[in-house]
Amino acid sequence: MRHASERMVRELLRRIDEDKSGLELYISAIEVYKEELRDLLSRRGDSELLQLRHGPGNLTRVDGVDLRGPIRNAEDADELMRLAHLRRTTGDNGVHMHSSRSHLVLQLALRRAGGLFGQLSLVDLAGSERQQRTGGIRRAEAIEINRALSSLGDVMSALIMNAEHVPYRNSKLTALLQPGMRRGCRVVMLVTASPAAIDAPETAAALAFASRARAA
């Protein structure tokens, strides 16, 4: 996701420069690891734990997140994104040496004198894992990864069905994404698919998951 994020930031900075309306760009990076929220850009520690609160209108907010900025150029943004990826939890799951063990939410906030103007969340989801393939290595992490993905699927299904209740609170991931996943918001999903036959079950599952997002 990092290269896509870098291109997105460059485009935002270009448009801000053209617009001349006083907009400023700020960046935060939050990791969802085993149902804990960690600030990957905290200046107070390598991975400070954060608290999720429910504010006005029942919308969620994160207390204490270090909002970095204003971002003046692409190089400063690139350095922050490199730091976030360096601090993100990775490990050997028996299939990949540096497998992502968490979900990463990179938030780009546009602000001006009047307050928040808009926000874009770039989410790098850890892939679902089959215990038969990984051999149970890092099992507790895999369980939480899959549980959060299942909760995200439930939220998408509820939005598709126009359900009265959308279960945002079933996981920290969906609660964190609630402000950008309400009806009327725009959601785009990019899927990384492997052409290898051995990865066919995971590829099929990823494409099926993306199909649900498209319907939502």
Where are these regions (language model features)?
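Conserved AAA+ ATPase "sensor/coupling" helix adjacent to the nucleotide-binding pocket
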Residues: 155-159, 206-213
